[in-house]
Regions:
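Active-site beta->alpha loop and helix N-cap motifs at the rims of alpha/beta catalytic domains
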Residues: 2-148
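A general structural signal for well-ordered alpha-helical segments in protein cores
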Residues: 29, 61, 65, 90, ...
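Alpha-helical structural signal in soluble globular domains
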Residues: 39, 63, 67-72, 96, ...
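Secondary-structure boundary/capping positions in well-ordered alpha/beta enzyme cores
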Residues: 75-76, 134-135, 161-164, 276
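Catalytic alpha/beta core domains of metabolic enzymes, predominantly
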Residues: 130, 142-248, 258
Length: 309
């Protein structure tokens, strides 16, 4: 029987951290890691969408993970997303992540070409084989990857004993129940986890059986999601929903900017905590002067919501 307790809770998706010249800021990575640990999160999800993984070289992704682990190892759960758009680089990152001592590796399916289930399974299992002592998380995000996790594909992957969880970012919350049922049938009640992916419906996902969440806005307002999670565990859904509504309004506000959502969030963290995380890497759009109004209002909304907890 596997123990999924280390996956239960709030796990922010870790932001890419850049120096002024556009290179990886190792100091920024370490500072953000320390900041999130101090906020009381369960863990971090490194090298995913929020980490701008598809715009980074594998060597950069290795450097980021090493910097995170230098601060986080033994303190919080670390899940490393290792997928690249070719198997060889993905396998290399998986082996590196295991050497770093992460709790789990994760992967989206290959993007662009719509591959058959058996090819996706081969791709994921190749990564898992390169990290044979590390648990594996399937990342389902069909609206961006272009490929959805089907039940036949999940059943095939559950033949791999290292498959411990699904990070589910599809919009229908019923998918959480489908994946959870399949995982429990294969692993037992406490042997398989499902993470809620869409931040805007965290409470809904938890109500449908998600064990916790991995989200791209958690790092800018972890207090709100930690409190939501506590209230769900206490059975106080009305109070959890009230905070969810506040978080959603903040997300909608941040999305009003010309600059990418991650650029907005990193600027808010700079203003609130002095974290120098840089902007975003092209072709993602950076902030423009006109975004000042959105950034300032989103920061105000976060501070007000946290103060009301």
């Amino acid at each position: 029987m596997k123990d999924i307790n280390k996956y239960r809770g709030i796990i922010p998706a870790f932001y890419a951290c850049y120096a002024p010249d556009g290179s990886i800021s190792i100091e920024g990575v370490k500072a953000l890691t320390r900041h999130l640990i101090a906020k009381g999160v369960k863990g971090v999800y490194v090298g995913g969408s929020s980490g701008e993984c598809i715009y980074q070289h594998p060597d950069e992704r290795k450097a980021v993970l090493e910097a995170v682990m230098s601060e986080a190892k033994g303190k919080i759960t670390v899940i490393a997303h290792v997928a690249c758009n070719n198997t060889a680089d993905s396998v290399e990152l998986a082996a590196h992540a295991e050497k770093c001592g992460v709790d789990a590796i994760a992967a989206i399916p290959p993007i662009y070409f719509h591959l058959p289930n058996y090819a996706i399974a081969d791709y994921w299992n190749a990564m898992s084989a390169a990290a044979p002592n590390t648990e594996f998380v399937i990342y389902n995000i069909p609206q961006l990857a272009g490929t959805a996790l089907t039940m036949p594909l999940l059943q095939e992957m559950l033949k791999n004993p290292k498959v411990i969880a699904v990070k589910n970012s599809s919009m229908p919350t019923q998918d959480i129940q489908l994946f959870k049922d399949a995982g429990i049938a294969a692993r037992g009640e406490d042997g398989f986890a499902v993470f809620n992916g869409p931040d805007e419906q965290f409470v809904s996902g938890r109500a449908m059986g998600a064990d916790g969440g991995i989200g791209g806005t958690y790092a800018v307002m972890p207090e709100l999601f930690i409190r939501m999670n506590e209230l769900v565990e206490q059975g106080n859904l009305p109070a959890a929903r009230a905070i969810q509504y506040k978080a959603d309004r903040i997300i909608y506000k941040m999305c009003e900017a010309h600059g990418n959502l991650y650029a907005v969030q990193k600027e808010i963290l700079r203003r609130m905590y002095g974290l120098e995380l840089g902007g975003v890497r092209a072709p993602l759009p950076n902030l423009i002067p006109e975004d000042e109004v959105v950034v300032a209002e989103a920061q105000r909304m976060i501070e007000a919501a946290v103060a009301e907890l």
